[in-house]
Amino acid sequence: MGDHDALFKRVFAVPENAAGMLRSVLPAELVAALDLSRLELLSGESITDNLDEQRADLLFRAPLRELGEDGQVDHVYLPLHLLVEHQSTPPPRMPLRALRYVLPVWQGALSEDPARKTLPPVVMLVVYHGPRGWTGPRSLHEMVAGLDKLPVLRAHVPNLVLLIDDVSALDDATLLARPLSPVPMTAVWLLRDSRHMDALIAHLPAFQEVLEQVVEESPDEALFFLRYISF
């Protein structure tokens, strides 16, 4: 198969496609509060000062529908990270790694507006397609020793909760029910089943109509998907 990272970035760097992904995964209350029709892709370089090891794959921000207390538009920052994991278990330190993506977002916001007194919300979404599903920690607190025995510590220890989109756990009906247009729908299907050609062939009938729409409406993307499958 082709480069999973290239597939992910090509498709989901398009804000309209990323918005469909976010509508599928974010809590409904947050989706209702965000104006995802105005989702904006930010430049990773300007956020992370060219530190590749601290850059999420894609960084977006979306305005809240209601104005802030000062009458200004508030934004929520939404890093999307594709975690391609070929081992049988997810990395045990993903929440800590995610914190390294979040901190530069805050630093960038303060650099952009040195007068601001608050930090923007950041919601970290990890798109995972490991072979056996996500079994790793979903929060920093799960990694910190002693919190169960001494709960009073929880209020004083930093936490970060990940949103995990485990595409390997999606069946055909669940995936097809997502609010995705044909191109991103096909991309998620390929990410899910691309490990095994037998799986792609077995699930092809379920996605036949979607693929026909891609060929008709987005022939360049159809060719890209074909090359992805061929390599």
PLM features: residue spans?
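Elongated, amphipathic alpha-helical interaction scaffolds
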Residues: M1-F231
